[in-house]
Amino acid sequence: MSDYLLQMNGIVKTFGGVKALNGIDLKVRPGECVGLCGENGAGKSTLMKILSAVYPHGTWDGEILWDGQPLKAQSISETEAAGIVIIHQELTLVPDLSVAENIFMGHELTLPGGRMNYPAMIHRAEALMRELKVPDMNVSLPVSQYGGGYQQLVEIAKALNKQARLLILDEPSSALTRSEIEVLLDIIRDLKAKGVACVYISHKLDEVAAVCDTISVIRDGQHIATTAMENMDIPQIITQMVGREMSSLYPTEPHDIGEVIFEARHITCYDVDNPKRKRVDDVSFSLRRGEILGIAGLVGAGRTELVTALFGAYPGRHEGEVWLDGHPIDTRTPLKSIRAGVCLVPEDRKRQGIIPDLGVGQNITLAVLDSFSKLTRIDAEAELGSIDREISRLHLKTASPFLPITSLSGGNQQKAVLAKMLLTRPRVLILDEPTRGVDVGAKYEIYKLMGMLAAEGVSIIMVSSELAEVLGVSDRVLVIGEGRLQGDFVNHELTQEQVLAAALSQPDSHNNKDRKSA
């Protein structure tokens, strides 16, 4: 009998004559966690769709061996029956159903006569949550009453209830806090010890290094290398993923910092559902020409509320003033903000950044269509010229600007949103989680673009939950905690510990507005 639980040999998948996968191999032993690494568009998702029979046997070439026997599944239900379960990045839970009902969805326990056996399902659901070290979870409550970390655990419990022997985890930590990520990684280690195998897909290479035994890298649809993690480090993984040496994940583009051009004065935002509660409380700061200002803080600190208020997009009541070049400007709506020279690339690009029904080019020119208008017609030639220039400038990978934007990888969708805002020629560019869900190569290009824009005199505000990213690209760092300004640091030998200490400190324990640190 084979030592491997799973063997995918010579997998080839073709779309319209183009090989998306060209001879990919992937092997997983029982109790092993394999990190599947590659840039967006490398073929990771296609490979997992083949494994889980989203693309059934016969639509691809090669072979899959499961426990040494050929697997020729025609449906997801067949692969799940075999013990292969995928947990998608976007969770598949039904918010209004209870935790127990979600765990048993499609596999409900019934009594004679066909009625649901709720006591048995609740008992089994409680046992599964105890196994995942969440003994106090009320499995009778709607799953919507629990946060992202708990919902991720419910998805894992759902998979274990299907007798999963191989878990495929696709970007499992994308919506989790740092503490929730640590819980998730501990649970994966426990599952490994019980013989459950995992394929872990993540752009967060520190997580991959922490939990995976083996790293398998694919690039442009081809298998590059499979190596034991103990013989690898993160820079080596990055080099294999992008196909070139990267001296640093954070490129240093020299840029001069000039005079103060932008000021936020006494910004206060009130909760949409509870108008008496302040989500942002009297925050003031300044920004210099060509400066990159990072905003750090814990989840729920009020960072996104602050920057959406600066752009005129905060849905609740908010107060304060925004000044540019020494004068107050009108930022009551996004359109007024754009016209004043202030632009925002939002946190959730799928809901707020792109229009999925439009093409790549249409999304890019959406904010400046009036500049291509001639009476009642659009100057299509001028519009296409601008689109092509931005695609080239941002190294946006697309076969055609007329393709649907949903056909692009996450990193290239983000570049399209950036291109849209750059066409407005902003003086101040606000980036809210600009690299979330973006692969390491695209991250590098976004950081490099930020440095180039700063060198051109554009002032940048960047919100990020990744402290390493904040420290890697920012000239100055603001720390927000419980809606208040907790620290204003010059980024010279600044450490993650200093930033975290400021984020965790009590808002009234010191005079934040005068706080500077080297």
Swiss-Prot record:
Q: What's the source species for this entry? A: Pseudomonas fluorescens (strain Pf0-1)
User: What GO cellular component is one of the record's annotations?
Assistant: plasma membrane
Mind listing the GO molecular function terms for this protein? ABC-type D-xylose transporter activity; ATP binding; ATP hydrolysis activity
Name the job this protein performs.
Part of the ABC transporter complex XylFGH involved in xylose import. Responsible for energy coupling to the transport system.
Write the record's keywords in alphabetical order, separated by commas. ATP-binding, Cell inner membrane, Cell membrane, Membrane, Nucleotide-binding, Repeat, Sugar transport, Translocase, Transport
Alphabetical list of Pfam families matching this protein = ABC_tran (PF00005)
How this chain sits in the membrane, per its record, is: Peripheral membrane protein
Annotated residues for binding of ATP: 38-45
Top EC category:
translocase
List the taxonomic lineage: Bacteria, Pseudomonadati, Pseudomonadota, Gammaproteobacteria, Pseudomonadales
The keyword Translocase belongs to this UniProt entry's keyword annotation: yes
Task: Indicate what this protein is called per its UniProt record.
Answer: Xylose import ATP-binding protein XylG
